[in-house]
Structure formats: C-alpha cells, structure tokens
C-alpha cells in the first residue's frame, strides 16, 4: 500500500548548501495543480531536502523521486543516486524526474538502472544534427568561437564534457554551448551569464 511519494532535489553531497533548481521543482510538486494528476491524487507528496533526512526516513520510503530542471551528462544525477544508496535507499525505489534532459544523460541514468522521466529530450546540437563531415567542421568552428571568447577550459568548448546542449533556463547549464553563458573568469572562478 503506497500512500506517500517522497521527493528529493538532486544535489551534490559536497555542496549541499548550494541552491539548486531541483528545490524549485520540488516546491511545485507539492502544489495543487500537480495533485490533480491521477497518479498523485490520493498520495501524500513528502519533500525531503537533506541527505541526513533521507537516511532518517529510509524505512518509510517506498518511492523516491529525485528532481531537477535539467539533466546534462547525468554525472550529477548518478553522484546523487550513489549518495542516496549510501544512505540506505535501494535504486529500485528511485526514479528521476526532470523538465529537460540531454539524451546522453538520460542514457547514463537508465544505464545505471534508474528510470528517468523528462518532458523534453535533447540531442547534441551539432553531432546529432549533421552528417559526420559537416559536424566535424562545425565542431571545429565552435571550438574556435570558444577560444575567441576566451573559454580557458577545453572541456567546456562544446559545453561540459562535450554535451553540445542548447538549453537555457533561469541559470544556463554549463552543458550548453559556451557562447550562451560564458563570461570569463573572476578571481579564478568561472563566471556564468
């Protein structure tokens, strides 16, 4: 008998105090419009915000939905899932819910054995939309643009880990091609637009 669904914002265990967009999504999951969906109508949606609270309530959790606004490579989600498992919650109880996901991130999460649900699935902006030879030219062009705007870290030339995302939200993910978000460095830290 399932009377409660637990939701948890995807977060990094090392930076848990950092405000993440998953917190905002969790807030909406508790609202009236969401409760009108038949799957949630007779369920209590319980928000858990910290890893220590997850551990404290692990025996009550039958379904845990990890939420975020965007999944890029899947690295953050997999790290969060691993931390959740360390707190005693098995992955067969875990699902990921996101607004937008890169296909590569979706595959990474599913490859680990955790279902992921997204409103929008995005392919790589260049590699998945052009023939190989044309894509290679466009990738080199994007790398030149990244150098011109002084993106110092080569692993960001095509977005984090070459995600080639074309996604912007309140805070543009670094998976997005850098000319959308890169503002250079200040005091040794990457500045985001």
What kind of region is each of these model predictions?
Residues 1-3, 55-60, 89-90:
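Flexible, charged surface loops at secondary-structure boundaries
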Residues 3-28, 32, 79-193:
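PRPP-dependent phosphoribosyltransferase catalytic core
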Residues 18-63, 72-79:
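Short, glycine/charge-rich flexible loops or terminal/linker lids adjacent to PRPP-binding catalytic cores
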Residues 66-67:
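Generic enzyme active-site microenvironment
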């Amino acid at each position: 008998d399932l009377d409660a669904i637990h939701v948890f914002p995807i977060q990094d265990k090392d930076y848990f105090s950092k405000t993440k967009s998953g917190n905002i999504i969790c807030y909406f999951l508790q609202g009236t419009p969401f409760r009108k969906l038949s799957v949630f109508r007779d369920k209590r949606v319980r928000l858990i915000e910290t890893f220590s609270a997850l551990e404290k309530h692990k025996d009550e959790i039958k379904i845990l939905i990890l939420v975020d606004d965007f999944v890029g490579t899947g690295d953050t989600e997999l790290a969060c899932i691993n931390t959740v498992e360390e707190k005693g919650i098995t992955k067969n109880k875990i699902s990921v819910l996101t607004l937008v996901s890169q296909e590569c991130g979706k595959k990474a999460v599913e490859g680990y054995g955790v279902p992921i649900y997204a409103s929008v699935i995005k392919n790589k902006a260049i590699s998945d939309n052009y023939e190989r030879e044309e894509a290679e030219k466009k990738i080199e062009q994007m790398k030149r643009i990244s150098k011109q705007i002084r993106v110092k870290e080569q692993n960001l030339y095509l977005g984090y880990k070459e995600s080639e995302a074309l996604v912007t939200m309140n805070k543009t993910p670094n998976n997005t091609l850098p000319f959308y978000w890169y503002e250079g460095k200040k005091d040794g830290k990457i500045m985001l637009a």
